[in-house]
Amino acid sequence: MYKTKLIPVMNEDAVIVQQTDSIQDPKVTPDDTVVDSSGDVHEAIDDDVEASSPMELDSAVTNDARVLESERSEKDGVVGSEEEDEIKSEDVLIDKDDESSEVKEEEEEEDGSDDQSSELGSEADEKELDLGLKEEKKGVSDYKSLLSEFDDYVASEKMGSGVSRALSYGFEVGDLVWGKVKSHPWWPGHIFNEAFASPSVRRMRRIDHVLVAFFGDSSYGWFDPAELIPFEPNLEEKSQQTVSKHFVRAVEEAKDEASRRSALGLTCKCRNPYNFRPSNVEDYFAVDVPDYELQAVYSVDQIKNSRDKFLPAETISFVKQLALAPQECDPDSLKFMKKKAVVFAFRKSVFEEFDETYAQAFGTKSPRSSVSTLEPHNRAPPRAPLSGPLVIAETLGDLKSSKKPTKVKVSKKKDKYLLKRRDEAGDKSVQFGEIEASSEASHIQGIDGSLDGDFGLQRRAPTLQTPMKDEKSGIVSMDFASSNTAIPGKEFSASKPSLDEEKGLAEKSKERMEERAAVLPEHGKSEAMASLKPKEEAGTDLGSAGSSLQPLLESHTSASEGKSSTGSVIKKVKVAKRSSSEMSSENPPSEPKKKKKKKKEPDSDHPVKRKNLYSGEAGAKKLSQLGSAHLQTYMEADVPQLLSHLQDLSLDPFHGLSVASFGTARKFFLRFRSLNYQKSLSVSSSDATVENARDTKPSKPVKTVKRTEDPSKAGKKRLSSDRQDEIPSAKKLKKTNQLKSMASEKKIIREAKDSIKPIREPSRVVQAKPARGQTGKKTAPSVKVVEPTMLVMKFPPGTSLPSAALLKARFGRFGLLDQSAIRVFWKSSTCRVVFLYKADAQTAFRYATGNNTLFGNVNVKYFLRDVDAPKAEPREPENTKEDDEPQSQWLDQAPPLHQPTLPPPNVNLKSCLKKPVDDPSSSSNNGNGNRAAVRVKFMLGGEENSSKANTEPPQVTMTLNRNSGPSSSSSSVPMEFVSKKFQNVVHHQQLPPSTLPPILPLPPQYTKPQQLPIKPVDHVEPPMPPSRNFRGPIPAVSAGDISHQMLNLLSKCNEVVANVTGLLGYVPYHPL
């Protein structure tokens, strides 16, 4: 027999009623549901359903199929049990009475033959009814199989292994989590229900993985629950990973979701029945939480948990606390945001939703009219959760913090740099450091620490100190990585050998130390000094002092412990350096004394410097002055904390700004360093190389340079002269630091000179050329002789020239510059920079000639020229500099034309600025003096002075002697007394040598007006061969007194100088 089966179809009202019953809404009851005697739910098919489109039917059937899924499963179970009972009963009946059953079967066969016609009629009626139902529900039967398969898939997925695995790790569907995506930081997201995902997303499913939807970019991925971490406990750490706008937006969305879930517990259907709308998945609702995005999908369990988390007492306490201290709350914290969301949601649910009085009072539009509360189905989600790209989870061996991930790389580079600089001290220092680091690592295996500090601490430790320092003196101890043990929170990544291996390595290292100290004392000490110098000159004075302090402080505790043989080796040397009595009782400290005596023999040229070095006994006596009680006080204070401050400072230079007790630690280590290191600073090897390059005679010893530095800084030990060639790389690496120190010293000198003299010295005798050899023998920067030297740069024609500011930036680091003398000559493609000290100019010249890319890929030629004229004129230094460069270049190439006879330099000239016309006769005697006594050149008027120089020399200081003849060499011609205009004229004319002596007055037709404009002063002829110059006539000046012209010249100078200011960064000139 065939039974008629009606397929149940529910309308929207029925679905809403059934789903909202779980949210406790007894007001609405189903209208169209009919329950028959067997418990099956049947519903009438409305006319609207018949007229509906296939898509609407599909949605209706889908809702119906999902709602009745649980009912079907229950029915299947009941039917199955009933069938089993029937089978059992039939078996019993057959066993009891087989004969009666056979009789019944015969009777049924007879009855069947009689009623066969009636059964055929009933079957025809059933077929007709089935055909009618199929015609009424067009297309529904086509979807039945697909919907059933989909329901089965969803049911299996919901109870899949991924969800069960997530539950084992404490996660549930919908929880907020952090997931690590490849090539991205930890990203916020939430565990997404797979039933809402599209088929394309579900196809990518992995076994035992859960679907995570991320915030921000709506990306998604399949993650192992073991690789996820909770959101709220890790928010403070993970939110600081990066400042990318996408990441910040994702974190904000995650915080907003957490706040919305807090407000979800106080959201109800009292005012708006459409706040909770059923979704396509069972037990999930689309909820509209006020003040948040619409259509947030939550499960029934999430809604109940949110309601259970609401604590009225806690909410009232929060409101009271906020009222008492509104500024003490952190508005950006997640806890505050969640509590605020609860308070606002409570207010929305209890008080009037739309405040009409506010709109009336301020004349604004009523919020009630602007919000449509009865149209929930027209709302669309602002963004699909899985609309972004699929991301791949990063496989994590163990959960590590990715905060500031680039710090590890920086530490690696820094450690490689330090190891490279300190390996020249010898292989044994690195070997001992590795042994010590491995032995120390075995004692701190249980300490957890951040990965950021591992590399810096592990690899820097072997090179902080070397064992040769212990052999050199009894003060500095052998300690490589022991400072790491005093700092908790750090761990080593180095290999950890067994205890027997450590003992064997320690014994070998001890034997090698003794052999090295006994057989090669000189070599060991030299290497110790070489290893000490890069450490101190690398800018790690505090670090070196702290690391050497570590064994001193630990000697009190390690003396009684002696856990390993390595510790005993360190203990022996540490104890030796603490007092003179202990030093005299043991053998290893006695060896440094012998080495000190031997060290003085090869360096007999430096007896004074060697006296300043500490011997072992003297250092111990100096250290013993602290007293054991004094040291014990420091150790009892908190020695590990002091060492922790020191090591944090080495990793972060600004560590002391945020630590209150850092001042105490700094005083402690400075005090220790001042008691254990020499105070007299000897020049380093890089200083010696620079000074030797500055024409220093190699036979003379390098004198001690008294630097104006902090007296509390550690001393620098000078290498012996026979060992300087073994550390060439250290010299190169310290080049930058040396240049910086030179610049700072010269700045101090300049400030001191400016405070002594308000105006540049008007009368100062410039030293002659023989003084050049003395620049390398300067004993202190304060006694350096000002010897202006200019660096001339000749660029190829047609290339762009650097500006004055660029020249100042390129060469300012080499020393003090005369900024007013920097010139850029565009016509001749020449630039000029004047250094106040010749040594600085030589350093800059060597650097420029060795660097081909200083001004780009341009072939620049560099020349050094002496500027022997005094800088007494504060009014016209630029004229002085302009005359020097082309004159020196031309005089080296052209035959002498106006070289005077050089009288003895026994006249100290007076400044013509103070008395320009009072004593013209006194200046006439100096016009032809030698270049050592020449002092002034004023050529702003140009040709009027130069022309008179040829006719009436006894009247002017810048004129030539009539009786002067050509000198033997052009190199002795002074550049100071030749004017620019006269030089240019001679430069153009190029008369043959036979016409040079003597110089006679020129005919009057060659005479030119006396006054010339001032502009040509800034354009000096370039230092090029005479053949390229234009040949012009030589101007002449009529004989007579030049006092009037001199007054005009001085007045014009005053007018020019009066308008000069310091707006462009130059020092303003002082008026006359």
Curated annotation (Swiss-Prot):
Motif segment (Nuclear localization signal 2): 596-603
Annotated compartments: Nucleus
GO CC term, one of those recorded = ESC/E(Z) complex
Q: Which cysteines are joined by disulfide bonds?
A: none
Compositionally skewed regions (Basic and acidic residues) per UniProt: 66-77, 498-526, 706-729, 871-880
Question: Biased composition, Low complexity: where in the chain?
Answer: 25-38, 921-930
Knockout-associated phenotype:
Delayed flowering associated with reduced H3K27me3 level on FLC. The triple mutant pdp1 pdp2 pdp3 has increased levels of FLC, MAF4 and MAF5 expression, but decreased expression of FT.
List the PROSITE patterns hit by this protein, alphabetically: PWWP
Query: Which parts of the sequence belong to the PWWP domain?
Result: 173-234
Record region (Disordered):
21-133, 365-387, 486-619, 681-738, 871-931, 944-973
CDD domains, A to Z: PWWP
State the UniProt keywords alphabetically. Flowering, Nucleus, Transcription, Transcription regulation
**Where on this chain is Nuclear localization signal 3 (motif)?**
705-712
Q: Where is this motif: Nuclear localization signal 1?
A: 402-409
Q: Which GO terms describe its biological process?
A: epigenetic regulation of gene expression; flower development; regulation of DNA-templated transcription; regulation of photoperiodism, flowering
Output compositional bias ranges, type Pro residues.
897-906
Q: What positions does the record give for the motif labelled Nuclear localization signal 4?
A: 733-740
Subunit annotation: Interacts with MSI4/FVE. Component of the PRC2 (polycomb repressive complex 2) complex which regulates histone methylation on histone H3K27.
**Reported function:** Together with PDP2, PDP3 and PDP6, interacts with MSI4/FVE and MSI5 to suppress FLC, MAF4 and MAF5 expression by regulating the function of the PRC2 complex and modulating H3K27me3 level, thereby promoting flowering.
Note the PANTHER family from the entry: PWWP DOMAIN-CONTAINING PROTEIN (PTHR10688), PWWP DOMAIN-CONTAINING PROTEIN 1-RELATED (PTHR10688:SF5)
Give the family per the record: Belongs to the PDP family.
Name of protein: PWWP domain-containing protein 1
Tell me the organism: Arabidopsis thaliana (Mouse-ear cress)
What lineage is on file?
A: Eukaryota, Viridiplantae, Streptophyta, Embryophyta, Tracheophyta
